[in-house]
Amino acid sequence: MEIPKLLYIAVIAIGLSGSLTCATPLANPWGDPEAEANPEAKATAEATAEAIAEALAEPEPALPALPLLMFLFTLPALQHWIEKNWING
């Protein structure tokens, strides 16, 4: 089963959200011009934005779970055929 791309994006965004909040210093919430943001947090935010943009740019495969769904829909018919021909013979 394929995991949706949006789930990967959500995990990356949630995992890095702690470092993203460090980009604005909490000691000065009004944005003092002399206060420098953390360069590591800025780099992390840029990398996260780039990863999300790349993930959204890739085309999504059309119906990746279709073979699995087809198999699951045929299971009752297979069960009926096995019971009719092999078990109740």
UniProtKB/Swiss-Prot annotation:
Superkingdom of the organism of origin: Eukaryota
Sorted UniProt keywords: Amidation, Ion channel impairing toxin, Neurotoxin, Secreted, Signal, Toxin, Voltage-gated sodium channel impairing toxin
Cell compartments where the protein resides: Secreted
Listed GO CC annotations: extracellular region
Keyword Signal: yes
UniProt GO MF annotations: sodium channel regulator activity; toxin activity
Modified residues (Asparagine amide): 88
Tissue expr: Expressed by the venom gland.
UniProt main location, coarse: secreted
Propeptide: 23-61
Region forming the signal peptide: 1-22
Note: Negative results: shows low activity at hNav1.8/SCN10A (EC(50)=2.6 uM) and hNav1.9/SCN11A (EC(50)<1 uM). Does not exhibit hemolytic and cytotoxic activities on HEK293 cells.
Family: Belongs to the formicidae venom clade 1 family.
Function: Toxin that potently modulates mammalian voltage-gated sodium (Nav) channels, reducing the voltage threshold for activation and inhibiting channel inactivation. Shows activity on hNav1.6/SCN8A (EC(50)=176 nM), mNav1.7/SCN9A (EC(50)=102 nM) and hNav1.7 (EC(50)=154 nM). In vivo, causes spontaneous, gradual and long-lasting nocifensive behaviors by intraplantar injection in mice, as well as pronounced swelling of the injected paw. Does not have effect on insects (blowflies).
Name the record gives this protein: Myrmicitoxin(1)-Pm2a
Higher taxonomy: Eukaryota, Metazoa, Ecdysozoa, Arthropoda, Hexapoda
